[in-house]
Curated annotation (Swiss-Prot):
Official protein name in the record: Gamma-glutamyl phosphate reductase
Top EC class, one word: oxidoreductase
Keyword NADP part of the UniProt annotation: yes
Family per similarity comment: Belongs to the gamma-glutamyl phosphate reductase family.
Principal location listed in the UniProt entry: cytoplasm
InterPro entries: Ald_DH/histidinol_DH, Ald_DH_C, Ald_DH_N, Aldehyde_DH_dom, G-glutamylP_reductase_CS, Glu-5-SA_DH, GPR_dom
Function as written in the Swiss-Prot or TrEMBL entry: Catalyzes the NADPH-dependent reduction of L-glutamate 5-phosphate into L-glutamate 5-semialdehyde and phosphate. The product spontaneously undergoes cyclization to form 1-pyrroline-5-carboxylate.
Matches recorded under PANTHER family: DELTA-1-PYRROLINE-5-CARBOXYLATE SYNTHASE, GLUTAMATE SEMIALDEHYDE DEHYDROGENASE
Organism from which the protein derives: Mycolicibacterium gilvum (strain PYR-GCK)
GO molecular function: glutamate-5-semialdehyde dehydrogenase activity; NADP binding
Reactions catalysed according to its record: L-glutamate 5-semialdehyde + phosphate + NADP(+) = L-glutamyl 5-phosphate + NADPH + H(+)
UniProt keywords, alphabetically: Amino-acid biosynthesis, Cytoplasm, NADP, Oxidoreductase, Proline biosynthesis
Domain of life: Bacteria
Any one of the GO CC terms: cytoplasm
């Protein structure tokens, strides 16, 4: 009989140990004062800026690896950090520090006829797992929002951003140590082995919720295999519908902004719907404008293209029969993210907003506005495309649950 030499803890054990440390940290975070959390967030912003050089060097190493492996330009843009983007990341932490603290907020309360006093108040979720692709800014956004809402966070980023994420987390943990807080409030899980995702999403009893951020493949895999609660985020086949009453100058401006501002993000428009009543005029005009901006317009889209989240300078074009045709098309092909109508007809706008099934519905505005910062939430943990427990851009309140507090005076319940 052979005897194996002792080995380091396996990956499952590493992930579970990290979750236990996060649980311990979360218990302390749950009762921190708002002032303490805000001070820690401002210190974290300072530490990110102090470490800009190390962060950018780590990011450049990630970019070099990504380029050598043929990563598409849109994905390189998501991965890239610049001095301005690092400054923006730090500013995001300061913005979160300035937001109202949701923890302890009383949602409702009453005194029962028997004298019992009830109140329902917000409490942290506990341990939040984030699984995300090559976007280093998510590392800090997730930390800021989870800390302010009293949660600990386990981060499992993409291996493509491993060096960037490590440099950022080092800065965040140093800030927590400076403020004498538990550094395990934020932990970065190994990204080289995909099994770490499995161990995280199946850590029932150790992790309270997992939020996947990324493409459809990642999100579907997490939701399918998870044994802990999940919140689906981000897959965005967003449509812009140009109604028969639309001002075409307005429509052109909105369509171009929704498609070309940042084509690699989930709130970018992927489909353009044009009302049949104005197709003869609107199709050539909007197609020419999009093509002049470098967009490939799929004029006779396949079924797959109608369902695609391109995340690139591509857009599917379809002709629909009136507002009901647009609603039917969107409810068939949309992903429940963001849908927009361009119209001067109030009745059409109201019908569209009432009947389209999406987390956000825009009237005469670009889909690009579906964003936590644009909505005034500061950074966002993601944009939920499901209906429970949160929907749309997820800010601080969406990272809480509730607890009932009942005060009595020796009350007992009669038989």
């Amino acid at each position: 009989m052979s005897v194996q030499a002792p080995s380091v803890p396996d990956l499952r054990q590493q992930v579970h140990d990290a979750a236990r440390r996060a649980r311990s940290a979360a218990r302390g975070l749950a009762t921190l004062s708002t002032d303490t959390k805000d001070r820690a967030l401002r210190t974290a912003a300072d530490h990110v800026l102090m470490n800009t050089r190390a962060i950018l060097e780590a990011n450049e190493a990630d970019l070099d690896t990504a380029r050598s492996s043929g990563t598409p330009e849109a994905m390189l843009d998501r991965l890239a950090l610049t001095p301005a983007r690092v400054e923006g990341i730090a500013d995001g932490l300061r913005q979160v520090a300035g937001l109202p603290d949701p923890v302890g907020e009383v949602l409702r309360g009453r005194t029962l006829p028997n004298g019992l006093q009830l109140r329902q108040q917000r409490v942290p979720l506990g341990v939040v797992g984030i699984v995300y692709e090559g976007r280093p800014n998510v590392t800090v956004d997730a930390f800021g929002l989870t800390l302010k809402s009293g949660n600990a966070v386990l981060l499992r980023g993409s291996s493509s951003a491993a060096r960037s994420n490590a440099a950022l987390v080092d800065a965040l943990r140093a800030a927590l140590a400076t403020e004498l807080l538990d550094v395990d409030a934020v932990q970065l899980l190994p990204s080289a082995d995909r099994a770490s995702v499995t161990h995280l999403i199946q850590a029932r009893g150790l992790v309270d919720v997992v939020i996947p951020r990324g493409g459809a493949g990642l999100i579907d895999a997490v939701v399918r295999d998870a044994q802990v609660p999940t919140i689906e985020t981000g897959v965005g086949n967003c449509h812009v519908y140009v109604h028969s009453s639309a001002d075409l100058d307005t429509a052109e401006s909105i369509v171009l902004n929704a498609k070309t501002r940042r084509p690699s993000v989930c709130n970018a428009a992927e489909s353009l719907l044009i009302d049949a009543a104005v197709a003869d005029v609107a199709v050539p005009r909007l197609t020419d404008a999009l093509q002049a901006a470098g967009v490939t317009v799929h004029i006779d889209p396949t079924e797959d293209e109608l369902r695609a989240e391109f995340l690139s300078m591509d857009i599917a074009l379809a002709i629909v029969d009136g507002v009901d045709g647009a609603i039917s098309h969107i409810n068939e092909y949309g992903t429940g993210h963001t849908e927009a109508i361009v119209t001067t007809d109030l009745a059409a706008a109201q019908r569209f907003t009432e009947r389209v099934d999406a987390a956000a519905v825009m009237v005469n505005a670009s889909t690009a506005f579906t964003d936590g910062e644009q909505f005034g939430f500061g950074a966002e943990i993601g944009i939920s495309t499901q209906k429970l427990h949160a929907r749309g851009p997820m800010g601080l309140p969406e990272l809480t649950s509730t607890k009932w507090i009942v005060w009595g005076d020796g009350h007992t319940r009669p038989a």
